């Protein structure tokens, strides 16, 4: 059983080391097998790099022929290693300029300080003044002219109703 696993591992590594097909770059034109041997870091950035072949229509503007997405390790930005050295002219291990921007943003995001705990909304205490009803339980005394009698209450109600209907007393 152990020999069978070793044979399978060797076969898989041999196939992945070989580019899938043509001599000018294989499947999609990118050296895919080279990534099988590398130990990838914890963070990789997908970069759009020229593939020089593959896709529909090759390099002549066909579908998928000119560019391909390839993982580029971010550790080259920290260690100064020359991973991806076929792309010269940038300060991040020779990555293409678009990828150099992505790596710089990733470095900023990883180096940014933590925001900490969420802010607690603090309000000033509210001092409400309670309004108490009057404490006197004695019946309120009305004046002599304010006392309403039964007959005058009916007359007052009828005069209010007449005022609403449009009847007015003649004024002199």
UniProtKB/Swiss-Prot annotation:
<dbReference type="GO" id="GO:0042600">
    <property type="term" value="C:egg chorion"/>
</dbReference>
<dbReference type="GO" id="GO:0007304">
    <property type="term" value="P:chorion-containing eggshell formation"/>
</dbReference>
<comment type="similarity">
    <text>Belongs to the chorion protein S15/S18 family.</text>
</comment>
<keyword id="KW-0732">Signal</keyword>
<feature type="signal peptide">
    <location>
        <begin position="1"/>
        <end position="17"/>
    </location>
</feature>
<dbReference type="GO" id="GO:0005213">
    <property type="term" value="F:structural constituent of egg chorion"/>
</dbReference>
<comment type="function">
    <text>Chorion membrane (egg shell) protein; plays a role in protecting the egg from the environment.</text>
</comment>
<protein>
    <recommendedName>
        <fullName>Chorion protein S18</fullName>
    </recommendedName>
</protein>
<dbReference type="InterPro" id="IPR005649">
    <property type="entry name" value="Chorion_2"/>
</dbReference>
<keyword id="KW-0964">Secreted</keyword>
<dbReference type="GO" id="GO:0005576">
    <property type="term" value="C:extracellular region"/>
</dbReference>
<dbReference type="Pfam" id="PF03964">
    <property type="entry name" value="Chorion_2"/>
</dbReference>
């Amino acid at each position: 059983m152990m020999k069978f696993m070793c044979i399978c591992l060797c076969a898989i590594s041999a196939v992945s080391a070989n580019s899938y097909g043509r001599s000018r770059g294989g499947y999609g034109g990118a050296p895919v097998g080279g990534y099988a041997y590398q130990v990838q870091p914890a963070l990789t950035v997908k970069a759009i790099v020229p593939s020089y072949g593959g896709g529909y229509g090759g390099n002549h503007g066909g579908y998928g022929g000119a560019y391909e997405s390839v993982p580029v390790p971010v550790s080259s930005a920290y260690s100064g290693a020359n991973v991806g050295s076929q792309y010269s002219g940038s300060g991040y291990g020779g990555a293409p300029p678009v990828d150099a921007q992505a790596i710089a943003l990733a470095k900023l995001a990883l180096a940014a300080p933590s925001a900490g705990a969420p802010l607690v909304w603090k309000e000033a205490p509210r001092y409400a003044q309670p309004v108490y009803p009057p404490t006197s339980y004695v019946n309120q005394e009305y004046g002599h002219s304010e006392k309403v009698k039964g007959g005058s209450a009916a007359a007052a109600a009828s005069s209010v109703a007449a005022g609403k209907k449009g009847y007015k007393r003649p004024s002199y």
